[in-house]
Amino acid sequence: MLAKRIIACLDVKDGRVVKGTNFENLRDSGDPVELGKFYSEIGIDELVFLDITASVEKRKTMLELVEKVAEQIDIPFTVGGGIHDFETASELILRGADKVSINTAAVEDPSLITKIARTFGSQAVVVAIDAKKVDGEFVVFTYSGKKNTGILLRDWVVEVERRGAGEILLTSIDRDGTKAGYDTEMIRFVRPLTTLPIIASGGAGKMEHFLEAFLAGADAALAASVFHFREIDVRELKEYLKKHGVNVRLEGLR
């Protein structure tokens, strides 16, 4: 059985990590390269960089950053945010990103999923889905959760797999940033609809929440602030999960 993965997410703006971190032993906690290296050294399984600037003129900064990160870390890393076309996705992968995460662009042009998958393999395509319940149904939202697409989550999950995605990054809009726990109802809803790995996102606040996400059917759990502010220690989290019967990678912990 594949090990469950713990993923740290970094919001990057103009080549710097924003939303703050609390690592006293880092010279510069705003440097994504240094922070990425640090996370890879303490046992985080994967990194996600979200480019929240995501404008054309700032793209060069992100490309240079991806190259630097690729040289420094030895864990998979995904880049998302503002990837609107095949050219941008392609350039990020060629510069060293292991995967790209697409969201709004995939909804507006689903053929983009297929193009990236055919060129670089399904494993390089993560489709990020932001969803919440509307009138009793899980519905897909785009533009950072602002636009209700009217597309039902169940239909989009099936199409995403059919189009060639390798993974789904499932974010509960209602849980994001609350630290109230992952939306296990949504994870359980999506699990039987797809064979793709599901990354749970939105709501991590304590170690039990990771366990709940995995028990609900998630293959990976993503978090940001609980790691950045050291509210949860990666070693303790993995040992806790192992103790509760979850298969996690313990190599590389420190």
UniProtKB/Swiss-Prot annotation:
DNA damage listed as a keyword: no
The reaction(s) this protein catalyses: 5-[(5-phospho-1-deoxy-D-ribulos-1-ylimino)methylamino]-1-(5-phospho-beta-D-ribosyl)imidazole-4-carboxamide + L-glutamine = D-erythro-1-(imidazol-4-yl)glycerol 3-phosphate + 5-amino-1-(5-phospho-beta-D-ribosyl)imidazole-4-carboxamide + L-glutamate + H(+)
InterPro entries (alphabetical): Aldolase_TIM (IPR013785), His_biosynth (IPR006062), HisF (IPR004651), IGPS_HisA/HisF (IPR050064), RibuloseP-bd_barrel (IPR011060)
UniProt-listed Enzyme Commission number(s): 4.3.2.10
Record pathway: Amino-acid biosynthesis; L-histidine biosynthesis; L-histidine from 5-phospho-alpha-D-ribose 1-diphosphate: step 5/9
Compartmental location: Cytoplasm
Record SUPFAM superfamilies: Ribulose-phoshate binding barrel
Annotated GO CC locations: cytoplasm
Ribosomal protein in keyword set: no
Gene3D superfamilies per the UniProt record, alphabetical: Aldolase class I
Catalytic residues as annotated in Swiss-Prot or TrEMBL: 11, 130
Keyword tags: Amino-acid biosynthesis, Cytoplasm, Histidine biosynthesis, Lyase
One function term, GO molecular function aspect: lyase activity
GO terms under biological process: L-histidine biosynthetic process
Domain of life from the UniProt record: Bacteria
Entry function: IGPS catalyzes the conversion of PRFAR and glutamine to IGP, AICAR and glutamate. The HisF subunit catalyzes the cyclization activity that produces IGP and AICAR from PRFAR using the ammonia provided by the HisH subunit.
Similarity field: Belongs to the HisA/HisF family.
Quaternary state and interactors: Heterodimer of HisH and HisF.
Record's protein name: Imidazole glycerol phosphate synthase subunit HisF
